[in-house]
């Protein structure tokens, strides 16, 4: 089962035929599929939630009310979290707005929260914590905390094509915890703390496609906003998307073990894959917005 609860897609990948001809999708089919996926990745904030605030009043996340109540009732974390005026205040005794002090507070609480089972994935990677109103980075925190606290993440997607318009798709490892066995973009991943999107996309292309040269990144970026409930909590992500044209004599090959296979398919094939649920929902919409 995939992260968004869709069963059986790993088996469906094995049954998909890359050799057959696929019909050209109509503009109506494209519009309907875009709308369908958009409804999945962008939800209204649920009613039974509370804002997550710093002691200085910075709004940084969103959490289900029942989880916030459970967390503040847990004696192990009574000094780190407090419910005040229908909001979850983190580190209520932290009276400074110093980013280093707030980062250290996140570091102190992250491992105990993980060990207590409040979130599952420990990534050992720091991401920027943003004030949702100003957009300013106010601290750094362990990546695993972000869905649990409903904090904003930023990511990059490299939509790779050949000069003839054929599109690269990468088969996600079946051992990945999120969307295993689905076909993704040429490269995609989180923007780490203090990293630009340009640096992040070059790093991801090197790690996932094995390319350090032999490609050209397009000049324009688009942003896909993802807001939805996930098993870990609330997913708030701004995904920055760029087009990448790969030279004909460059041959992408995964090097970090997170991709099992990289193929080059026609746009008609790609549409059929998206329509049949063989791509992650967010990646499917990235493809549709970028190529159709």
PLM regions and their residue ranges:
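Short aromatic/basic micro-patch
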Residues: 264
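N-terminal leader/linker segments that precede catalytic domains of diphosphate-processing enzymes
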Residues: 2-182, 190-203, 211-251, 267-278, ...
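Short glycine-enriched loop/turn motifs at secondary-structure junctions
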Residues: 253-258
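Catalytic-pocket segment enriched in acidic/His residues
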Residues: 207
